[in-house]
């Protein structure tokens, strides 16, 4: 059984649409605890910490009543948008979102998503979980933005969508129409590389 160690609705929808069986549990990990300047390495470490937190605290988590699986896979993810070498997380307010979009208009950046997959054995009666293997990788996608009119930027920022997304845009939402093209994994831009997940599971004999 796959556990998605994230509260992200985008990642949840990706797994649901792919008909991959899973349960979603937020790790509630404090991202400020990780100090790493390299953006790619930062996303990878954050994904690992999120997955590890679920593994370490599994006995305290209120699991579904019929969670009687002998093997459990825990998936942690974290996404950060890189623009001109700088990390763009979620904008703190509308003013910051407007400034960022004014810079990104007609330009490109990179969406990095760190992935960690912990494979483990699980005793449902004692709720003892033992991690047997981990796979980690950062997947990066190049995102090209359309040249926007100032009014378009204002309207998008006023929708408030940018305030809830890494980089200040949502490919699957209103922001999708402002993205010219993507080089690399499409689903990665939404927070989870489905091809990477599929290949990682299949390597361990799990066919999602």
Swiss-Prot record:
Keyword 4Fe-4S set for record: no
UniProt cross-references to SUPFAM superfamilies, sorted A to Z: ITPase-like
Active site: residue positions: 78 (proton acceptor)
Cofactor: a divalent metal cation
Keywords from the UniProt entry: Cytoplasm, Hydrolase, Nucleotide metabolism
Record GO cellular component, one term: cytoplasm
An example Gene Ontology biological process: nucleotide metabolic process
Single GO molecular function: nucleoside triphosphate diphosphatase activity
Compartments in which it is found: Cytoplasm
Keyword Cytoplasm: yes
Highest taxon in the source lineage: Bacteria
EC number from the UniProt entry: 3.6.1.9
Catalytic activity: a ribonucleoside 5'-triphosphate + H2O = a ribonucleoside 5'-phosphate + diphosphate + H(+); a 2'-deoxyribonucleoside 5'-triphosphate + H2O = a 2'-deoxyribonucleoside 5'-phosphate + diphosphate + H(+)
Enzyme class: hydrolase
Main localisation: cytoplasm
NCBIfam families: maf (TIGR00172)
HAMAP family: Maf
PANTHER family found in the cross-reference section: BIFUNCTIONAL DTTP/UTP PYROPHOSPHATASE/METHYLTRANSFERASE PROTEIN-RELATED, BIFUNCTIONAL DTTP_UTP PYROPHOSPHATASE_METHYLTRANSFERASE PROTEIN-RELATED
Protein family according to the UniProt entry: Belongs to the Maf family.
Summary of the function given for this chain in its UniProt record: Nucleoside triphosphate pyrophosphatase. May have a dual role in cell division arrest and in preventing the incorporation of modified nucleotides into cellular nucleic acids.
Protein name: Nucleoside triphosphate pyrophosphatase
Organism (species): Prochlorococcus marinus subsp. pastoris (strain CCMP1986 / NIES-2087 / MED4)
